[in-house]
């Protein structure tokens, strides 16, 4: 097993259709996630924050230990930032719901494609058509022998 065999195997693996499709899906999914996160953070959450008393969810935190100054050096407060968790949870729910709707739409479109019947095969020739075809072929044969 030489180096070139390893590289050829890797190239064959990387160029398979499903690997490339998956890579494209991951890239598009990342971009889609950013769009949905922006919609959640910038469009959906502000009105929800207003409804619950003007709260910005990302700012919600529980202070475990206050900030303190020791020997002229300020030590930051120790906080449990559960607001970020709430924001990420809302992002996840909306992204999952969006993907669910998209997959459901694709499944519906595929079902419609399957329901469309294939065009009917042309009917078999009648006995008269078969006889006329045989007569025509015999006449062509006789004309060819002359």
Swiss-Prot record:
Full protein name: Large-conductance mechanosensitive channel
Keywords of the record: Cell inner membrane, Cell membrane, Ion channel, Ion transport, Membrane, Transmembrane, Transmembrane helix, Transport
CC per GO annotation: plasma membrane
Any one Pfam family match given in the protein's UniProt record, by short name: MscL
Alphabetized HAMAP family for the sequence: MscL (MF_00115)
Organism: Phocaeicola vulgatus (strain ATCC 8482 / DSM 1447 / JCM 5826 / CCUG 4940 / NBRC 14291 / NCTC 11154)
Biological function: Channel that opens in response to stretch forces in the membrane lipid bilayer. May participate in the regulation of osmotic pressure changes within the cell.
Compartments in which it is found: Cell inner membrane
Gene coding for it: mscL
Keyword Disulfide bond among record annotations: no
